[in-house]
Amino acid sequence: MADNKDISVLIVDDNDMTRETLRVILRHDGYNVVGEAMDGDGALEMATRLHPDIILLDVVMPKVSGIEALKSIRMVMQDVQVLMVTANKDQETVTEVVKSGISGYIIKPFNAKKVLDTVQVVALKVRASRSGKAV
């Protein structure tokens, strides 16, 4: 297991199984999963309370979409790293997600390697930012 406990992660997805899968993958690799939310409103509340380093944020959720939640989160936390999680591969969605100022995205269905590879790139940015180095 890697030593990633210095990186805190918030998981936001309306699907219980997806949240559980991401939690297991990340914790197995040593990441500190500090919270989980089921919708965009919960994402904003937990992000402002917990100040995670990384947020894994589903694009399509009831009430408030991931993209709308991201806009709200960015208003109060400009530096948080956000990885969007989506099952939608169409170019329009990917373009909208990328334009929203994210650090990357994970396409569903995903596997542990894809999740960990993507999160590791962002974790390196977090660590570099803490030490004042550019990535």
What are these regions (language model features)?
Residues D16-G35:
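Two-component/phosphorelay signaling modules centered on CheY-like receiver
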Residues D39-G42, S65-E68:
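Acidic catalytic/metal-coordinating carboxylates
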Residues L50-L56:
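Active-site beta3 strand of CheY-like receiver
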Residues M61:
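Receiver (REC) domain active-site loop signature in two-component systems and cognate sites
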Residues E68, K89-G104:
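Alpha4 helix (beta4-alpha4-beta5 surface) of REC/receiver domains from two-component response regulators
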Residues E92, F110-Q120:
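C-terminal output helix
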Residues D117, L124-V135:
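CheY-like receiver
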